[in-house]
């Protein structure tokens, strides 16, 4: 039977670990009720807290501990029912935690990535740090459905519909969906890259999907099948230490391509000095850098987002300039195009383009999409169309609108 003397661990370490698990439970309540229950159970259990706190600090991450528990065989039952399994299986849980890492590889993050890649022309050599299994190195291979106000657009790969279908609500986008990038070279960097052709790595990748997220699991499995058909180069190493060599390899492999470095939700795992070193390298090395991170992970990006009026906890930036807000998994994207129009202004213009002029169904459609009476809708639209920003955005449409209004 596994026993532990609680007096061997400082109270501060127990409290630190308990607080970490409580914060996780609070933040992730909507994503996984089971993990919330387990996290709170551990946070209030002195014996399990002592066991968790014996792990190296980086291995105490709640999602890592809970995933290892599942893989070790703890059944998906309430914490009260499963507690004895946690205790009995702890040696296996700890062994897994010491050899594995949280390598969440969610293809849905390709939706904001595509928004940024749309601004880069020509062939692309894509390098991703924190690539895990490389599922987000293939944004050109997936089907996308973009839902905007009053319209929906589906974009297919060149060879037809993909088995991976990603859906995102997008605001502030223009008339056409983001273009598909021409990716001619791919490389991922990760401390412990996963090979989806190996059953053990594939099992771990799937285990990182939380219990209730069956739709997400389907996406990960389908994306892994695509990656397995043409595995990218995945280099084991630290992001800051390996990025220079990866860029050099990309320049040699694709000399005519634009090198794009992507860091989707990974810089938060580096300390502040390493983040700054990485950002400085990207700024000085003649590469394009796409960042998708929490608002304050790179403080100057967060400050720039404040100045631009970009809201939200996650910010998409290109070369250090914020271009959109997004949720952490790319399910909602609000684009700020720099035209002087707000995202909602752009959506108004594009809605009118799609539903030009008075029609029999216009009034009901306006109420459904904008929750406005038709008169109020046109008042708002007139105000937008008369602005210099709208004339810069689409002078032909603005002129046509003005001519129609005079009739």
Locations of regions flagged by a protein language model:
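Class I SAM-dependent methyltransferase Rossmann-like catalytic core
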Residues: 37-123, 135-143
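A short SAM/SAH-binding and catalytic strip from SAM-dependent methyltransferases
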Residues: 259-272
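Short, Lys/Arg-enriched anionic-surface-contact patches
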Residues: 340-347
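Class I S-adenosyl-L-methionine-dependent methyltransferase module
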Residues: 55, 75, 100, 104, ...
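Short Lys/Arg-enriched helix C-cap and helix-to-coil transition segments
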Residues: 389-403
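C-terminal substrate-binding/active-site "lid" region of AdoMet-derived donor-dependent transferases
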Residues: 269-318
């Amino acid at each position: 039977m596994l026993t532990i003397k609680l007096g061997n661990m400082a109270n501060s370490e127990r409290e630190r670990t308990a607080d970490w698990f409580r914060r996780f439970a609070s933040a992730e309540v909507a994503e996984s009720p089971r993990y919330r229950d387990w996290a709170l159970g551990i946070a209030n259990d002195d014996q399990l807290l002592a066991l968790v706190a014996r792990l190296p600090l980086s291995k105490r991450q709640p999602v890592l501990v809970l995933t290892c528990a599942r893989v070790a065989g703890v059944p998906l039952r309430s914490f009260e029912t499963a507690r004895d399994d946690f205790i009995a299986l702890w040696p296996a849980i700890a062994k897994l935690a010491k050899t594995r890492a949280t390598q969440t590889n969610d293809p849905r993050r390709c939706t904001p990535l595509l928004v940024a890649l749309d601004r880069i022309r020509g062939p692309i050599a894509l390098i991703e740090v924190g690539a895990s299994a490389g599922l987000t190195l293939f944004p050109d291979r997936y089907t996308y459905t973009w839902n905007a106000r009053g319209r929906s657009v589906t974009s297919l790969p060149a060879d037809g519909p993909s088995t991976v279908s990603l859906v995102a609500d997008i605001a502030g986008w223009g008339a056409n969906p983001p273009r598909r990038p021409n990716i001619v070279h791919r490389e991922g960097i990760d401390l412990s890259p996963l090979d989806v052709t190996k059953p053990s790595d594939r099992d771990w990748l799937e285990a990182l999907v939380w219990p209730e997220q069956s739709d997400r699991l389907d996406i990960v499995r389908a994306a892994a099948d695509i990656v397995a058909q043409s595995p990218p180069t995945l280099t084991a190493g630290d992001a800051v230490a390996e990025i220079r060599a990866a860029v050099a390899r990309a320049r040699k492999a694709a000399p005519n391509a634009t090198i794009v470095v992507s860091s989707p939700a990974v810089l938060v795992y580096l300390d502040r000095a390493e983040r700054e070193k990485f950002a400085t390298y990207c700024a000085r090395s003649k590469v394009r850098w796409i960042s998708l991170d929490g608002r304050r992970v790179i403080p100057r990006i967060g400050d720039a987002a404040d100045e631009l009026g970009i809201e939200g906890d996650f910010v998409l930036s290109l070369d250090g300039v914020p271009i959109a807000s997004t949720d952490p998994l790319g399910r909602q994207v609000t684009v700020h195009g720099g035209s002087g129009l707000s995202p909602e202004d752009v959506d108004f213009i594009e809605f009118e383009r799609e539903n030009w002029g008075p029609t029999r169904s216009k009034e009901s459609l306006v109420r459904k999409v904008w929750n406005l009476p038709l008169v109020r809708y046109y008042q708002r639209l007139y105000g937008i169309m008369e602005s210099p920003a709208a004339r810069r955005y689409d002078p032909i449409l603005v002129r046509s609108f003005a001519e129609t209004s005079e009739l």
